[in-house]
C-alpha cells in the first residue's frame, strides 16, 4: 500500500550547487501544532501524514541537503488518546525520535500542569525554549530563552515566545499558577537581541506560538537593529502557501498535524537572506 505525505514547501531564493565560501545554503524545516498526530490518515486509497512519514521526509532532506535545521513551533501535545493517557510522556519520546533541533512550547504544553511540563522538558533530548514565561516572585525565566544552533560555520539563533492565553490555564493551578507570568513578547525579543552584536549571529528566527494575527502585530513592532529575519509561528493552525511579509519580516505557519511541513531554502550571506 502506498503511503505519502503532503509536503507544503515555502522557498526563498534559488539553491545553487556550488557556492563561494561567503555564501552558504541552509534548509529550514518547520512544523507546528502537531497535537499528537502520530498515525497516518487514510484518504481514498492512500495513507496521508503520520509521524513516520514526517520523519521519513525530514531524514530524506537531511540526506539530500548539507545544512538542515528542523524546528517545532509549539503544541506537540494533546489531540490523541495516547498523549492524554500518558500526559505527554509518550509524545516527548516520539518527538525525541523525530529529532527536532529546537522547539518552543505552546499553550497545550501546560495542559498537564507547569510542574509536569518542567519534567517533560527534562525528558526531551532537544532544546525547548521560551523567553517570555517567568516566575512572578523572582523574575526568573522558566526555560532557556533562546538557542543558537551552529552549523557549518553559521550561527542560527531561535527565540521562543508563547501566547498570553496560557495564563488562563496556569491560573487553574492553585499552588503554582499564581506565580507564573507572561511578559510582553516585543520586550523579551529586545532583551535577547540587545545582548548580541549584529555580527554574533547569521540568522535570527522567532519561534512563536501566539497566532498568525499576533505574529503580524509582533513583526510590526520589531526594531530593525534587532535583526529579526523571520517568524515561524503556530497556534492558529494557519496554512500559508507563501510567507506574509510585515515590516520586512517573513511570517509563516504550517497548518496543523503531520500531513504537511514548512520549508525554507536559504542562501546566507553573513546577515542577508538572498
Located regions from the model:
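Acidic, metal/ion-coordinating pockets
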Residues: 2-274
Amino acid at each position: 500500500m502506498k503511503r505519502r505525505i503532503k509536503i507544503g514547501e515555502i522557498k526563498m531564493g534559488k539553491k545553487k550547487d556550488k557556492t563561494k565560501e561567503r555564501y552558504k545554503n541552509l534548509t529550514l524545516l518547520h512544523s507546528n501544532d502537531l497535537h499528537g498526530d502520530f498515525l497516518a490518515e487514510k484518504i481514498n486509497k492512500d495513507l496521508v501524514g503520520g509521524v513516520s512519514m514526517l520523519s521519513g521526509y525530514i531524514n530524506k532532506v537531511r540526506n539530500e541537503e548539507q545544512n538542515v535545521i528542523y524546528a517545532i513551533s509549539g503544541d506537540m501535545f494533546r489531540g490523541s488518546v495516547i498523549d492524554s493517557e500518558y500526559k505527554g510522556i509518550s509524545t516527548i519520546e516520539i518527538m525525541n525520535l523525530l529529532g527536532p533541533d529546537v522547539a518552543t512550547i505552546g499553550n497545550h504544553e501546560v495542559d498537564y500542569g507547569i510542574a509536569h511540563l518542567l519534567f517533560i522538558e527534562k525528558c526531551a533530548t532537544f532544546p525547548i525554549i521560551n523567553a517570555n514565561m517567568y516566575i512572578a516572585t523572582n523574575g526568573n525565566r522558566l526555560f532557556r530563552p533562546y538557542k543558537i544552533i551552529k552549523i557549518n560555520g553559521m550561527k542560527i539563533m531561535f527565540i521562543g515566545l508563547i501566547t498570553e492565553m496560557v495564563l488562563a490555564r496556569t491560573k487553574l493551578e492553585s499552588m503554582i499558577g499564581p506565580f507564573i507570568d507572561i511578559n510582553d513578547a516585543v520586550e523579551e525579543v529586545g532583551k535577547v537581541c540587545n545582548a548580541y552584536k549584529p555580527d554574533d549571529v547569521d540568522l535570527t528566527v522567532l519561534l512563536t506560538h501566539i497566532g498568525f494575527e499576533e505574529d503580524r502585530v509582533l513583526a510590526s513592532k520589531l526594531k530593525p537593529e534587532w535583526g529579526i529575519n523571520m517568524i515561524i509561528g503556530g497556534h492558529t493552525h494557519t496554512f500559508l502557501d507563501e510567507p506574509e511579509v510585515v515590516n520586512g519580516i517573513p511570517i509563516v505557519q504550517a497548518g496543523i498535524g503531520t500531513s504537511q511541513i514548512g520549508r525554507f531554502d536559504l542562501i546566507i550571506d553573513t546577515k542577508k537572506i538572498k
